[in-house]
């Protein structure tokens, strides 16, 4: 059987662009070869208003030996609940995770591209990006969405990671927040929240945060903060015991970034709800 390029099964070949040496950034490669595939490759007529689902509240806090990030599950479209079980927290590589607030569709595309960006860099360079490098790459992607943000489709991620180069492993958990222009801000207080319920969540974390807590205590504080946000912000969804919908939680430690099993998050959420029956104000 003839398997040559002139036979029945032509030999597969990659386009020259795939073999040309260049940047270790997958985003740069995509921008050069297929810019229409970028999440930010959209144009909006002047004065247009687009109705789209929005993710709401994300919280993050450090603990002794790592960092936890958690998000509620509600997505809204104006005054309507668009989705009750949306996932807004994603593991992006072995030592980082991202939570999203803002326009859900664009935000999810950006996070997926960010995860590919990190894997691509590691394959090309043979090493992982530093935590600062990861935060800067995400900053550039948020900045690229500025035109959409001005049209009302803003994306505001919350980035967390474990710094494998930190001098003190107990304080290696880090949190980075962004504004819609892509400016990045390192959080020094040990906790942060973004989204519509962030004001209430941060107020809760101000009282609940303990830098020496273990992972279990930090997860409990995160769920408590999301409960408080849902209590006062209609766009944030609290634990739904009827539909069995609970926050998505990721911990990042020296062992890596891990999604908490739903059985564990549901048990913690149920404990929080039970405690609020006795003390509604927390």
From Swiss-Prot:
The keyword NAD does not apply. This is Proteasome subunit beta. One of its GO terms (molecular function) is threonine-type endopeptidase activity. The formation of the proteasomal ATPase ARC-20S proteasome complex, likely via the docking of the C-termini of ARC into the intersubunit pockets in the alpha-rings, may trigger opening of the gate for substrate entry. Interconversion between the open-gate and close-gate conformations leads to a dynamic regulation of the 20S proteasome proteolysis activity. GO terms for biological process: modification-dependent protein catabolic process; proteasomal protein catabolic process. Its main location: cytoplasm. HAMAP family: Proteasome_B_B. GO terms for cellular component: cytoplasm; proteasome core complex, beta-subunit complex. Keywords: Autocatalytic cleavage, Cytoplasm, Hydrolase, Protease, Proteasome, Threonine protease, Zymogen. Residues 1-55 form a propeptide. It is an enzyme of class 3 (hydrolase). It catalyses: Cleavage of peptide bonds with very broad specificity. Pathway: Protein degradation; proteasomal Pup-dependent pathway. It comes from the Bacteria. PROSITE patterns: PROTEASOME_BETA_2. The 20S proteasome core is composed of 14 alpha and 14 beta subunits that assemble into four stacked heptameric rings, resulting in a barrel-shaped structure. The two inner rings, each composed of seven catalytic beta subunits, are sandwiched by two outer rings, each composed of seven alpha subunits. The catalytic chamber with the active sites is on the inside of the barrel. Has a gated structure, the ends of the cylinder being occluded by the N-termini of the alpha-subunits. Is capped by the proteasome-associated ATPase, ARC. Belongs to the peptidase T1B family. CDD domains: proteasome_protease_HslV. Component of the proteasome core, a large protease complex with broad specificity involved in protein degradation. It is found in: Cytoplasm.
């Amino acid at each position: 059987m003839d398997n040559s390029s002139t036979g029945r099964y032509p030999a597969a070949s990659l386009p020259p662009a795939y073999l040309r040496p260049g940047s270790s950034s997958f985003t740069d490669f995509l921008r050069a070869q297929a810019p229409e595939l970028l999440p930010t490759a959209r144009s909006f007529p002047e004065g247009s208003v687009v109705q789209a689902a929005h993710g709401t509240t994300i919280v993050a806090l450090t603990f002794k030996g790592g960092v936890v990030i958690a998000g509620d599950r509600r997505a809204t479209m104006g005054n309507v609940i668009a989705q009750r079980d949306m996932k807004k927290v994603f593991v992006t590589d072995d030592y980082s995770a991202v939570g999203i607030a803002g326009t859900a569709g664009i935000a999810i595309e950006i996070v997926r591209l960010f995860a590919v960006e990190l894997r691509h860099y590691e394959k090309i360079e043979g090493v992982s990006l530093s935590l600062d490098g990861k935060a800067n790459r995400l900053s550039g992607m948020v900045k690229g969405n500025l035109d959409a943000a001005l049209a009302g489709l803003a994306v505001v991620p919350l980035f967390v990671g474990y710094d494998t180069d930190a001098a003190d492993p107990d304080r290696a958990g880090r949190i980075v927040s962004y504004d819609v222009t892509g400016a990045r801000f390192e959080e020094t207080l040990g906790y942060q929240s973004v989204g519509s319920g962030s004001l209430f969540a941060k107020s809760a974390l101000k009282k609940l945060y303990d830098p020496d807590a273990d992972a279990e205590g930090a997860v409990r504080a995160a769920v408590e903060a999301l409960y408080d946000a849902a209590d006062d912000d209609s766009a944030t969804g609290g634990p739904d015991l009827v539909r069995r919908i609970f926050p998505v939680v990721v911990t990042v430690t020296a062992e890596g970034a891990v999604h908490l099993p739903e059985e564990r998050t549901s048990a913690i959420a149920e404990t929080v709800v039970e405690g609020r029956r006795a003390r509604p104000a927390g």
